[in-house]
Amino acid sequence: MSQQVIIFDTTLRDGEQALQASLSVKEKLQVAQALERMGVDVMEVGFPVSSPGDFESVQTIARQIKNSRVCGLARCVDRDIDVAAEALRVAEAFRIHLFLATSTLHVESKLKKSFDQVVEMAVHSVKRARNYTDDVEFSCEDAGRTPIDNLCRIVEATIKAGARTINIPDTVGYTTPNQFGGIISSLYQHVPNIDKAIISVHCHDDLGMAVGNSIAAIQSGARQVEGTLNGIGERAGNTALEEVIMAIKVRQDLLNVHTGIHHQEIYRTSQVVSQLCNMPIPANKAVVGANAFAHSSGIHQDGVLKNRQNYEIMTPEIIGLKEVQLNLTSRSGRAAVKHRMQEMGYQESNYSLDELYDAFLKLADKKGQVFDYDLEALAFINNQQEQSEHFRLEYFSVQSSSADIATASVKLAFGDEVHAEAATGNGPVDAVYEALNRITQLPIQLEKYQLTAKGHGRDALGQVDIVVEYEGRRFHGVGLATDIIESSALAMVNSMNTIWRARQVGIELRRLHQHNNSQDMQETV
């Protein structure tokens, strides 16, 4: 009987570190819920001590997630461990993930300690974390470049101290599959208490070998793989979990292991991560790319028509890609839209049918037939909209030609008031943005603008993703419409609402921080 490989997702921790603009608490919760639906065993959702915002998001997710174990990261520092435990204690099940550098380079140049001191710190921290939970993971940072004798020593010591999972990261993506698999084999051969812990791996993709190294580790006995959806992460990224999961599924004959993943949720979860993180998936990306199941060669097309297995080692249906069965138009009712959403894997609890249907009718009136990619885009935007937005775009008009400077008139509602402003700019989008900035008086700088067609043809929806800078922080905005000027305006308004909410949260967090400090002072006195 095959053994299970635990899937540990760190999209919301290691993956988010690569984003130009941090996710909001609501966006992080959406990602976490998608990962839960996909069936990940453990999700690492943040570094609680790093900021009040991270603490809040970890605590919020820990409170909401019921079917996956929620994990928080902590250095081998007492305060880190205590804060992580405080954020996680509301969870159904939680894990504290400790990490400490072990390579000679890191120990000497970064920590400036002896290896004996490093082992002592690790043991102390594992024991402290065990006071809060029996599920403690310890990571040997830069294990791929750690002398094997030292690695075996600290692994044995931390298992003895109570760590249930030992993670072996290839932190800088330095090793090759043969070499990395050998490291895992050495641990099984030379650590006497290795049977008392699960060996995990966490590989980075600097040399393009993260997935290969993870598979080699599984073959050598590792039973947990850490990574992110779509492989997002620092530098060249992390192990792409969807690739490891499907490699295990397709090559069970070779690997003789399995996962608890709901494979039909893979594509949808990949899209959620791509959309919310504003990181498009390359067309040639394995498993989830647009071309993953496309065949352009005549010979290949003929072979697929005769038997799909000629050129497909897995079917698109396995990861949740289904063929269109209904043509949706403005005459389609709520039941038809709901049915199609269910076929695509969406539950009604994940979106508002009334709001989605209203948006569907408006789009259907404009373009006639509405396709799956249109519905998914509408559902995504619908999910992004707060129940009560502070700013609302009421109206805009643009005059532009190749000979004259562009002029825009905009009406923006906030509260019970509607404000109007006109402005000129270097093109219609710039003019609209200048008018919006004049109304709100927010010192916003546009850093990134990206337009993506959500579908095919001239009537395709255009999604605009922007990154703006405000008071030293970056914020993401997204807009969707068949008119790219409208979607550009909506993206800016969306970013302004995100900024406004962040300001309100910041004010509340500062108030709570001042209140807690006041209490601490009273207790000290």
Swiss-Prot record:
Pathway: Amino-acid biosynthesis; L-leucine biosynthesis; L-leucine from 3-methyl-2-oxobutanoate: step 1/4. Keywords: Amino-acid biosynthesis, Branched-chain amino acid biosynthesis, Cytoplasm, Leucine biosynthesis, Manganese, Metal-binding, Transferase. PROSITE patterns: AIPM_HOMOCIT_SYNTH_1, AIPM_HOMOCIT_SYNTH_2, PYR_CT. It is found in: Cytoplasm. Mn(2+) binds at D14, H202, H204, N238. Pfam families: HCS_D2 (PF22617), HMGL-like (PF00682), LeuA_dimer (PF08502). One of its GO terms (cellular component) is cytosol. The keyword Repeat does not apply. It catalyses: 3-methyl-2-oxobutanoate + acetyl-CoA + H2O = (2S)-2-isopropylmalate + CoA + H(+). SMART domains: LeuA_dimer (SM00917). InterPro entries: 2-IPM_HCS-like, 2-isopropylmalate_synth_dimer, AIPM/Hcit_synth_CS, Aldolase_TIM, LeuA/HCS_post-cat, LeuA_allosteric_dom_sf, LeuA_bact_synth, PYR_CT. Catalyzes the condensation of the acetyl group of acetyl-CoA with 3-methyl-2-oxobutanoate (2-ketoisovalerate) to form 3-carboxy-3-hydroxy-4-methylpentanoate (2-isopropylmalate). This is 2-isopropylmalate synthase. It comes from Sodalis glossinidius (strain morsitans). The lineage of its organism: Bacteria, Pseudomonadati, Pseudomonadota, Gammaproteobacteria, Enterobacterales.
